[in-house]
Amino acid sequence: MRGAMLALLTFALSLATFIEVLDSTVTNVAVPSIAGSLAVSNSQATWVISSYSVAAAIAVPLTGWLSQRIGEARLFVWSVLLFTLTSLLCGMAGNLELLVVCRAMQGLCSGPMVPLSQAILLRAFPPERRVLALALWAMTVLLAPIFGPVLGGWIIDQFSWPWIFFINLPIGLFAFAACAALLRREPPDPHQPPMDVMGIVLLVVGVGALQGVLDLGRDHGWFDSSLIVGLSLIAALALVSLLIWESAEPYPVIDLSLFRDRTFSFGVAIISLGMVSFSVIGVIFPLWLQTVMGYTAFQAGLTVAPLGILALVFSMLVGMFLDRFDARVVTSFGFLVFFAVLSWDAHFTLTMSFWQIVTPTFIQGIGLPCFFIPLSAAILSRVPNEKLAAASGLSNFLRTLSAAFGTALSVTWWDNRAAHHYGNIAQSEIGRAHV
């Protein structure tokens, strides 16, 4: 595939990836609106987010196994179509219970979309242009979480919460039609390996319980809650059992042999740590703007959005010129930029203007593509073509799980520090009153 057809396929794959990643963040600002419309509490409305994240977390690592049984192109096309249809159902839901069920269905459909879009793009481009393909893919993965809160806030202000789901319909249908027309669907292998039933059960139970801990832990006081303790024990037992089972299973649902490649293992470890850091600043910064500086969700989103400008530009530059530089140098440069911006952010004060806050955020857009694109290229650089879908699914699962860890830990840390400082202020005021 070349020329206009390759460009159209790249555009369609990018759109599908964009709406999937966007949908995982756009609902964050819609919780109060959903709660008010459906007459439930804010904590109950957060199940709209949790149900999606749990279902997606279960589906992502199954991508490689499903691709073997169904075919990559067929699985991707059907995932896009079902994701679009479940978006329609989410927007039409008239009560919280139905909305949560539809969001869980949407999460299951979304799981294969991001890893398969990466694998299909890499296979469509010639080897010498794979870094450019990864740069195009990384742009959508990096930019969607940045613009999600802005778009979500604007849609809710101008229309109503169902439209954050309805907006997926034209985009999803176009991506489905284009991919269905352009992707060659190979017939499934008639000699299917036996189904790893035990592996699937352990994966679903372990990942579901772990994601439940991350989503519900803060609201239940973490390990002060018997629910969280129980879920943690279930997750630990199931995931340890999964590792033991899969290491001996001849036809595993998760291919642990990928970790024998040091490049894959090291790249996944570094990018996972990077996602923890990125998610921390991505959560704490808007939280500080809204709870301390008095910004609305939309204003906070506008403050973060400039990050996407330089990220877009440098994604293309890294994709075009990475082969002329040592990838380790580019990655280190991206990390140093990110570290410098974090140090800058640490000195923010309550008297800073909008533009003083935006400037370091804008500069941060240089570091993100320089860090993530070379690592994404390295992770898959030595993976055989027949294992690309499995490797992409596994690396994306660990990346997403790391972001969930970072989000849960950062919000808990924020709440604890806020309670500590508010307590000090209260004690100070009491002391003054007695004087």
Model-assigned labels for residue ranges:
Residues 6-64, 98, 160, 198-199, ...:
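Transmembrane core module of solute transporters
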Residues 177-197, 244-253, 350, 416, ...:
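Helix-loop junctions on the cytosolic side of multi-pass membrane transporters
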